A protein has these predicted regions:
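Surface-exposed, charge/polar-rich loops and edge strands
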Residues: 2-41, 45-185
């Protein structure tokens, strides 16, 4: 049986602090088995036993009930993570562009309207050095170039402009997550 990863948004940012051991315990208490995490940012690896949409709702409910805040869950297969890594349009574009730490895949709840992405790219063209590109499989690529902390392209702004929820992971994290997903059981 394969594995999926659930990217939980809003974990260990702002005031939403959760120890991964507590998250795993909450998921085990809710009936999930063979749960593991990668890094401290809400990357949960589970057996591929559930419908992704149903799994997302259940995970969001557990976080809300156990930890008292809303989190969006984006469930993806190993193939989708591999595609998000391989399809990175900014890879290898020089030392200031395409760095694995600076390029993020933003996993979206739905494929956004391409015209909304085009409008966002055009609007931001003169405001910063970041670059955006729409991928397939509900992924938006964002090269932060000079770092996330100095960017105006916050997750809230992206969600508002694109009309869907999303949570981001950098390429370094995605490679670690994929390696963990592909480990023998």
């Amino acid at each position: 049986m394969g594995r999926v990863v659930a990217f939980l948004g809003s974990i260990n940012v702002g005031g939403n602090r959760i120890k991964m051991v507590d998250l795993v315990a909450a998921l085990n208490d809710a009936g999930f088995e063979d749960v593991s995490t990668v890094a401290a940012s809400g990357n949960v690896i589970l057996p591929d036993r559930h419908d992704p949409a149903m799994l997302e709702m259940r995970l969001e409910s557990v976080v809300q009930q156990r930890f008292g805040f809303k989190s969006c869950a984006m469930v993806r297969s190993a193939d989708e993570i591999r595609s998000a890594i391989l399809d990175n349009p900014f890879h290898g574009m020089g030392p200031q562009h395409g760095s694995d730490k600076m390029v993020h895949s933003i996993f979206l709840s739905q494929q956004p309207d391409p015209s909304a992405v085009d409008a966002l790219i055009e609007e931001h063209r003169t405001k910063g050095s970041e670059r955006l590109a729409l991928g397939s499989n509900r992924v938006l690529f964002l090269d932060y170039v000079h770092g996330v902390g100095v960017s105006d392209l916050s997750n809230k702004l992206l969600e508002r402009r694109l009309g869907c929820k999303g949570t981001a992971r950098n390429m370094t994290s995605l490679k670690r997550i994929l390696a963990k997903m592909e480990e023998p059981a």
